[in-house]
Amino acid sequence: MEVAAGGGCGAGPPLLLSDSEQQCYSELFARCAGAASGGPGPGPPEATRVAPGTATAAAGPVADLFRASQLPPETLHQITELCGAKRVGYFGPTQFYVALKLIAAAQAGLPVRTESIKCELPLPRFVMSKNDGEIRFGNPAELHGPKVQIPYLTTEKNSFKRMDNEDKQETQSPTMSPLASPPSSPPHYQRVSLSHGYSKLRSGTEQMHPAPYERQPIGQPEGPSSEGPGAKPFRRQASLIRSFSVEREPQENNSNYPDEPWRITEEQREYYVNQFRSLQPDPSSFISGSVAKNFFTKSKLSIPELSYIWELSDADCDGALTLSEFCAAFHLIVARKNGYPLPEGLPPTLQPEYLQAAFPKSKWECAIFDSYSESMPANQQSCDLNRMEKTSVKDVADFPVPTQDVTTADDKQALKSTVNESLPKDVSEDTATSKDYNSLKARPRSRSYSSTSIEEAMKRGEDPPTPPPRPQKTHSRASSLDLNKVFLPSAPAANSGLLPPPPALPPRPCPTQSEPVSEADLHSQLNRAPSQAAESSPTKMDAPHAQPPSKPIRRKFRPENQTTESQEPAAAVGGAVSAAMVKPHPTVQKQSSKQKKAIQTAIRKNKEANAVLARLNSELQQQLKEVHQERIALENQLEQLRPVTVL
């Protein structure tokens, strides 16, 4: 006896089922539908039926069942489209039966078409390994006993409600029998742990015994069923797309995620926040597009996928990512790396409002600002010179400053005046840099950020970190007034009383004239420093600033013919000075080691950026090649479609 299925559904082609096909397909459908409803109710298997229009098959078990058919992924995608499940977004009984028919046709060697299911076909075979053997879904009468008749099928969907209290997460779902159908209206949507996963399909022999289901479909409704009928097909379709990306979904990663892969756990949140902090220390600030691009490109996802993730996560479309937007983008990338296809829209659990409510600011301050507790809001930052002096010193000087070696009051006065002269230029440059940086964005953001966040983000993300500042010989600004060089003691100056410096400097005034040096003379030497930058080393340039006034003049008088004469007054005058200059010498060596480390870091960053750009170049070249081939194919088709002119 043959029964027509799907006559009035319109979701798939009309289908004729024999008795054996009815029983086999209904049992498989009941098994897959039971996972979606949390398991059937108690009762003997023989008394249960698949109620029409009350159940839909879960996407996860259906995907595992179809993979057990050992058909290529392309064929499975074609079957999913032909049966109508991809169009309606879920597997009803009609779509499921048509898909099984198409699988049987493909296994029989027939083309995957709707015409192939009209002829008589053997039952589909689903092969898996158990105890190093093969088990097939063979004759259902031998495996399952009495037959079950199915009435005509409809495409009504069952409404699922979800438990609101998420602490009641169960570790095991109720058992089910092979012929049992799910209850017509389940009380809630069971959240089942995926610790073991539905890694293999149970065989027909295993179906004789009730077994717990531990696989849960991914794309169930995110809220109560009162959302309205319009929201269901979208989410079911997203679930279907996720489940049937078999060619890109590693099966071994299925157990790494809970039943809601788009919900960020506490451990993941801490990791994402730490990554954000490495790019931007201020969590109330944001990461620019170029910094995020360089960071996310290291995931080795394709450029179209990264672009799509950016479109989903950048909720306000301003070309930058806040902390919540960064966490959403990072979570999408991690999910994609673990085999989950990207959703068609940003899931509710990744919306910025949800993440901000889930991760309050107090937690951020406690967990993240342990080493950044000195930062304060922008509305409390004053723009006076003393506050900006501290900021500039923090930005420019990356190493301890030997201020304890400055002994005279004249030197302190000169250093203070030098700092006051150089600071307005640095502050103006920082302001101009922040203005240029803000002008590059699509539209301005009203977020507050500290005075150092932009510069540190540019150093860490957009460009490789640069070594400590060096003398700019051709720069129009007085580079000798840089704070680093103000506090740097010179290496030759430490041994000024013992070894003569190189005799390359021009003759200078006699040492006897250098004892009473006024503050005006010191300022005149500071003004002459830029002109001497081309012929003197950085350590020699810094000598007039970091040492007593008498020492630079005495050191400069070193002609070749008067070297021995100059050593005697130098030893007499520099006796007290050499004791003060012994301590800064290890600091200079320490600075050189820091410079080497900074250079090595810059080289490593440049190599990483070069590798990223090289891979990006290869991907773009491949895309260009594919587009070129597509163009040639279209031109050939156009030539064939043109009318032939007969002369």
UniProtKB/Swiss-Prot annotation:
Positions of Ca(2+) binding: 314, 316, 318, 325
Protein name: RalBP1-associated Eps domain-containing protein 2
InterPro entries for this protein: EF-hand-dom_pair (IPR011992), EF_Hand_1_Ca_BS (IPR018247), EF_hand_dom (IPR002048), EH_dom (IPR000261)
Pro residues: bias regions: 499-510
Domain of life: Eukaryota
Domain EH stretches: 21-122, 268-359
Residue segments, region Interaction with RALBP1: 501-647
Compositional bias of kind Low complexity: 221-230
Basic and acidic residues biased stretches: 158-170
Species for this entry: Mus musculus (Mouse)
Keyword terms of this UniProt record: Calcium, Coiled coil, Cytoplasm, Metal-binding, Phosphoprotein, Repeat
